[in-house]
From Swiss-Prot:
It comes from Mus musculus. Residues 133-187 are annotated as: Disordered. This is Proline-rich protein 29. InterPro entries: DUF4587 (IPR027904), PRR29-like (IPR038915). Signal peptide: none annotated.
Length: 187
């Protein structure tokens, strides 16, 4: 490096001049705009890179937990109890279990609570428009009465519900299944 004032180009600076500090020159690179369409191969590469990062993070978490457990041993898990009963005691317990009657569970269902019907809309939200294929709700629902069909043309689409005795709820006030149906009601 040459000193500025001496005119000496031999490469050896004179004693009177201070050495020049290094200068870093930054040149901006032209900006490249990435393409708006993602490249098919690049998406696969990015996904693979993310999966590898996730794998490395999970590996790091597991190893960190193993190291923490090794450095700070916690309380041991309780071991299962060891039975030291004799063979005769075990046989007696099995006999007692067999002698006991099986448990019978009766399911009693409460009636469904009925909410009072007030001015409720049939459509879930008032700000949504009614679909074009449905007419808007017009007050109370209409009930149409039709004459009963003749017995010869009557076809049951749905079988009748089972009698209460079939569901295991036979009691003093519930008749058995044979009394529940009469021969005329069956097809």
């Amino acid at each position: 490096m040459a000193s500025l004032g001496s005119g000496n180009w031999s490469g050896v600076p004179t004693q009177s001049t201070a050495p020049m500090p290094w200068v870093t020159i930054l040149q901006p690179f032209p900006w490249t705009v990435p393409s708006s369409q993602p490249q098919h191969n690049r998406v696969k590469e990015d996904l693979l890179e993310l999966m590898m990062l996730q794998n490395a993070q999970m590996h790091q978490l597991l190893l960190g937990q193993l190291v923490a457990d090794a450095l700070n041993p916690g309380p041991e898990w309780p071991s299962p109890p060891v039975h030291t009963d004799s063979h005769e005691e075990q046989m007696e317990e099995e006999m007692e279990m067999q002698e006991q009657e099986p448990l019978v569970y009766h399911h009693h269902y409460l009636p469904c609570p009925v909410t009072p019907l007030g001015p409720m809309s049939l459509w879930p939200a008032s700000f949504l428009p009614v679909p074009p294929h449905q007419p808007p709700w017009q007050g109370e629902p209409r009930i149409q009465h039709q004459p009963p069909a003749s017995r010869q043309e009557e076809v049951r689409d749905v079988p009748p519900p089972p009698p209460p005795s079939a569901t295991g709820t036979v009691g003093a006030d519930v008749p058995p299944a044979s009394d529940y149906y009469d021969a005329e009601s069956l097809p």
